[in-house]
């Protein structure tokens, strides 16, 4: 009896591996086919809006705000860590 059960488990594992590879390969092939298809006109139409968004993000005012935001939480974190370290040293 043990031999037929083993065979069935093997066949199941094989079918699983096949299904995974099969599901992965056609998706990749489709992506490759899409990249080769000429859709240049649509891309050109999209690009100016993206550029405008990037410009608005990288203005001096927004950059300054970002710097302030990024610097303040870092300072708080480092201060908290220092306090913890100091407490540990005192205990020793």
From Swiss-Prot:
Keywords associated with the record: Chromosome, Developmental protein, Differentiation, DNA-binding, Nucleosome core, Nucleus, Spermatogenesis
Disulfide cross-links: none
The keyword Iron-sulfur is annotated on this UniProt entry: no
Basic residues bias: start-end ranges: 7-19, 29-92
Tissues with expression: Sperm.
Localization of this protein: Nucleus; Chromosome
Lineage top rank: taxon: Eukaryota
GO biological process, alphabetically ordered: cell differentiation; spermatogenesis
GO cellular component: nucleosome; nucleus
Molecular function GO terms recorded: DNA binding
Segments of this protein annotated with the region Disordered: 1-92
Major place of residence: nucleus
Role: Involved in nuclear basic protein transition: histones are replaced by spermatid specific proteins which are themselves replaced by protamines in late spermatids.
Name of this protein: Sperm-specific protein Phi-1
Lineage, highest ranks first: Eukaryota, Metazoa, Spiralia, Lophotrochozoa, Mollusca
């Amino acid at each position: 009896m043990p031999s037929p059960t083993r065979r069935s488990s093997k066949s199941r594992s094989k079918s699983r591996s096949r299904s995974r590879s099969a599901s992965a390969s056609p998706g990749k092939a489709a992506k490759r086919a899409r990249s080769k298809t000429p859709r240049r006109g649509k891309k050109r139409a999209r690009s100016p809006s993206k550029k405008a968004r990037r410009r608005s993000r990288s203005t001096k005012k927004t950059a300054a705000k970002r710097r302030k935001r990024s610097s303040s939480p870092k300072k708080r974190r480092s201060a908290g860590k220092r306090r913890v370290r100091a407490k540990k040293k005192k205990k020793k």
